[in-house]
Amino acid sequence: AANAVELQRALGPAVYSERLRHHFETFITEDDFRRIAAIGFNSVRIPVPWHVFGAQEDAIANIPAIDYVDRAIEWAEKYKLSVLLSLATVPGGQGDSNESPTTPESTADWHSSKNGRHVALTTLEKLAARYGSAASLLGIELLDSPVVSVRKNIFTMTDGIPAHYLR
């Protein structure tokens, strides 16, 4: 499977959800944050999906990941690390980490639909509200690796996304 949608279709919602939960519990631990700080790094980048606060559509059986982000923020503060949160996926996909099923004709079209823009901005607003005052927050990346060559309707972007980000 090339992405979360295809993986869920292959495994089924129950198995997919259990594997995702196991991944969240074991992939990154407090010990990783301790070791990162111990070797002298001062920051971590945490990719978050558009559904970090829980499922927002029926297409994919998502479990909320926000508790794991909360935990990572706490660990970062404990080990004096800065955190860059990165919106890593959006409905419709934005490029290499496309959430949509992959086909030779598939394109990143999150910005072409009002819903895609709304979901992206709503998720960013919720992240800012939740972590904006966190001592460890370095920033929030608006979108991870958007592919320039597939942008459509670029001038219909929702207010709030700076024009320089679209260059």
Residues covered by each model-derived region:
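Aromatic- and acidic-residue-enriched carbohydrate-binding clefts of CAZyme catalytic domains
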Residues: A1-R19, D58-A65, G93-K114
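Aromatic-lined substrate-binding rim segments of carbohydrate-active enzymes
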Residues: H22-G92, P162-R167
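Non-catalytic accessory regions flanking glycosidase/transglycosidase catalytic cores in CAZymes
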Residues: A1-N42, S82, T122, A129-S133
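Glutamate identity and glutamate-enriched acidic tracts
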Residues: E6, E18, E25, E30, ...
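Active-site region of glycoside hydrolase catalytic domains
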Residues: G93-R167
